[in-house]
Amino acid sequence: MNEKHGGNFGLGEANVNFAKYFIGNSYLNPLTDPKETIFMANVTFEPGCRNNWHIHHATKGGGQILICVDGEGWYQEYGKEPRKLHVGDIVTIPANVKHWHGATKDSWFSHIAVEVPGENTTNEWCEPVNDEEYNNL
């Protein structure tokens, strides 16, 4: 790869552990140790890459915060219009909200993902964002 991707926080390694929940290639660069503090990681998506619909469950607190640091991407909550994301945008995702996020078709995209502490937190991975939906953005 000749171009630098991942913004100031670096590309990281191929996100192989979660590849089955993504269309396209993504990369993960952990920024904190979740044993010591809240978990934060820089997640980078190649053009056209997006994760499946998913839900960050919690009985209290929880959810996720995305801080956009490089490129352009998309965020969408189930049943709502998609939101185009740019460097500097921040997305606060409440617990128990079905959503997806990823790169635009023609841009790499990186965001810092912050796991918001909560009680009884789990992640539920759902269906992929189909090509027809994505290509019509």
Would you name each region that the model predicts?
Residues 1-39, 122-137:
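A short, N-terminal "cap"/entry segment at the start of jelly-roll beta-barrel domains
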Residues 28-30, 40-44, 65, 82, ...:
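Conserved hydrophobic/aromatic beta-strand scaffold that supports enzyme active sites
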Residues 30-32, 52-58, 77, 83-84, ...:
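Short histidine-centered beta-strand/loop micro-motifs
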Residues 34, 46-48, 68, 78, ...:
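A short, compositionally biased micro-patch
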Residues 41-60:
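Conserved short histidine dyad/triad with adjacent acidic residue
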Residues 48, 85-106:
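Conserved metal-binding segment of the jelly-roll/cupin
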Residues 50, 60-87, 97:
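A short beta-strand-loop-beta hairpin characteristic of the jelly-roll/cupin
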Residues 92, 106-125:
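A short hydrophobic beta-strand segment most commonly corresponding to one strand
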